[in-house]
Amino acid sequence: VYSGFSPMELYDEYGYTSYGFGVAKQTLHSVCKQLKSVLKRQKLKLVILEADILYQPNIKKQGSIHYDYAWLFAPFMYHSRWKDLKLRDFFTLPNLNRGNFTNGYFYSDKVNDFNVKPDYMKDIHKPPQKMEKSINKDFYKIYKLCKKYDVPLLVISIPTPHSWDNAKSNGVKELCERYNLDFYDMNLGLDGFDYSCHFRDNGNHCNYNGAKVVTLALGKYLQENYSLANHKGKSNFENWDKKLIEYKKAIASYSHKK
C-alpha cells in the first residue's frame, strides 16, 4: 500500500486526513501490533487494510523482526539496507519523504511496460483460496480491536496482477462476509487505470500515476460509503495545507529533474 496509496492526494481531492503505515514484507502479525499501538494514541475514523497481506507468509523468520517493527521508525523505505543505516536515518525519511509530508507514501515515477494478462480476473467462480490459520487468527484480532475502539474496518485490494486472482479475491470476500465488513477489490475493474504504464515493476507496485488513480478511486468509494469530514482549508488543519504545498512542490521538482 505504500506505493499504491498517497494520503496527500486523498487530502487534496477529498480533504480526508490519513497516513499509510505499510512497509515492505510486512506481516499481518505486525499490523496487528501496529494497530493496537496506534489506537491507544489516536482516535481513528476508519482503518483500511490492503488484502494482499492476507496471502503473505505470516511466520516469523530470521530477520523478520526488522519488518515486524519497521513501522516504529522513520525509514520505511530503508528496509533492504538496515545494516548500512546511520543514526540520523532513524529520524529522517529518504528522498521525497524527508520532512514526512508524504505521510507514508513512497513516490516513484518509474514506468515499467507491463503486459498484463487480460483474463487474470476472468474466472469469477474460482473457489476461495484458503488462508493460513495464523492469518485468520490475526485478522480476527484486528477485527476485535476495531470493534473495541468503535472504528470501521475496510478491506481493499489495489491492482496487483502479479500476485492476485479471483481465488484470492473470493477468499477475502468470504472472510469479510463472515465479519460483515466491506471489501473493495479494484482488480475487478478500475476506471482510468492503465496496466501498461501505471506500474513501476512487473505488476506488483504502482508508480505515481497509478497511485493517483487508485487514491482518487478510493476517495470516491469513501465519499459514497462513509461519513468522513472534509478538512481541507479548515481551521486547525493549516499544517495539512502547508504539508500539501510541500508535497506538490517536491513532486514537481522531482519530475522536472527527471
Predicted region positions:
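Generic structural signal for well-ordered alpha-helices
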Residues: 35, 139-143, 169, 173, ...
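Acidic-and-aromatic substrate-binding clefts and catalytic sites of carbohydrate-active enzymes
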Residues: 25-29, 131-133, 161-168
